[in-house]
Curated annotation (Swiss-Prot):
Keywords: Lyase, Magnesium, Manganese, Metal-binding. Its EC number is 4.2.3.57. InterPro entries: Isoprenoid_synthase_dom_sf, Terpene_cyclase-like_1_C, Terpene_cyclase_plant_C1, Terpene_synth_N, Terpene_synth_N_sf, Terpene_synthase-like, Terpene_synthase_metal-bd, Terpenoid_cyclase/PrenylTrfase. This is Beta-caryophyllene synthase. Its cofactor is Mg(2+); Mn(2+). The keyword Lyase applies. The gene is QHS1. It catalyses: (2E,6E)-farnesyl diphosphate = (-)-(E)-beta-caryophyllene + diphosphate. Mg(2+) 1 binds at residues 301, 305. A motif (DDXXD motif) lies at residues 301-305. The lineage of its organism: Eukaryota, Viridiplantae, Streptophyta, Embryophyta, Tracheophyta. One of its GO terms (biological process) is sesquiterpene biosynthetic process. Monomer. GO terms for molecular function: (-)-E-beta-caryophyllene synthase activity; magnesium ion binding.
Amino acid sequence: MSVKEEKVIRPIVHFPPSVWADQFLIFDDKQAEQANVEQVVNELREDVRKDLVSSLDVQTEHTNLLKLIDAIQRLGIAYHFEEEIEQALQHIYDTYGDDWKGRSPSLWFRILRQQGFYVSCDIFKNYKKEDGSFKESLTNDVEGLLELYEATYLRVQGEGVLDDALVFTRTCLEKIAKDLVHTNPTLSTYIQEALKQPLHKRLTRLEALRYIPMYEQQASHNESLLKLAKLGFNLLQSLHRKELSEVSRWWKGLDVPNNLPYARDRMVECYFWALGVYFEPKYSQARIFLAKVISLATVLDDTYDAYGTYEELKIFTEAIQRWSITCIDMLPEYLKLLYQGVLDIYIEMEEIMGKEGKAHHLSYAKESMKEFIRSYMMEAKWANEGYVPTAEEHMSVAFVSSGYSMLATTCFVGMGDIVTDEAFKWALTKPPIIKASCAIARLMDDIHSQKEEKERIHVASSVESYMKQYDVTEEHVLKVFNKKIEDAWKDITRESLVRKDIPMPLMMRVINLAQVMDVLYKHKDGFTNVGEELKDHIKSLLVHPIPI
């Protein structure tokens, strides 16, 4: 039944409807078949584990060990071997420090930095001539160029040799890709995909889909590894479909398209978002909760941006700050439904976490949601007053209204014993890695959505604030913002390397949040206006299994 309300003039926007309808509502659970597959997966996992452990014992095999770890990670099955990989890379780090003696220094550098080991980039100074230019011989090794290119994305501020290496490798690879279009189209396409999105910004499950057929074509591929990747992908896809069915039933119960028709109906895309943050089976409950939070955060965004009146939003903001069902009577009808929906998902998760003795973790998530709503209210106030904030004012609020500080805290809920009260408190202080992730989210969103938002009453975007304050063109601002985004990625890398008091799995959630933005907002707002690329991603991850 639809919720009725009085007629009020509103700054309504008509968003495209969902492209999925009820496609994911029903899940066909084939438990018997899955049990057989799980048994095979367990056997294959033991085979690969033996390969990992045996490679540790022979120093001359350390380059091959890195290549094995790289393949495991790119095939999307590293979650099976977290302890073994950590042990192997710690051994390599302890053995060599910054003085790597093996082949493939770019691979060594990237793999260790990805895992949180701060190895020096000085090794790449050997790639340059005395005049500072890169050696011509590097251009003859396409695989080496690609490895160096991928390694540059693990750089931090002040690593000029890697800044130079990125420019050099990109220039070389663009030419090579163009030259190979007709003679080797497969390699040309692979290079173009790498140039479009480097490994460090690519979601693990999407990379697995891309890499599995390539790995299969390698003459030296490990058959156990390949089979584990394929079977494991499909097994996880089944779990993810089951989760999405649960989230779909919850969304169907809210009936957002009818009860809150002004809002974007993007539940499936929100689940994809959560899947980008963590795909591993042990985070199933956390993923379901996060998908629901992102879905409602999208509705909240549209309520503040595109529908609610200023007075309604003030009342709703107060209700969220009080966080009590007794506040529901003070709200207009349509906001009662939304308010109840928000409270319900936190109550549900509180009950689940209570069984683990961690119900209090929800208090941190609630606090971050309250702050998130306060930032929306500040932007609504600016829009209501026609006030254009300074760039600094705007970003201080917009970092929070991006939703990423809230999501960074929320995504820790349900991750198990690795998450402590100290970790939540750390997240709420907005440490540099979370600030950098917020910057990426806000700047990428504003770059691609500001033109549409100018068509209605809306707070000035960060682009507009910057243009007005510094009297510069939009083109200039976009260059500045893209540079800020790249700097934010460097800050993320630095923090993942220097913060040893926060477990790497928690750091990875923040990194993954930034990766999702790069997928959804790389060239346009692919979340609001769902294009073929995102539809293909969702179908490949959640509809079509990999042929065995």
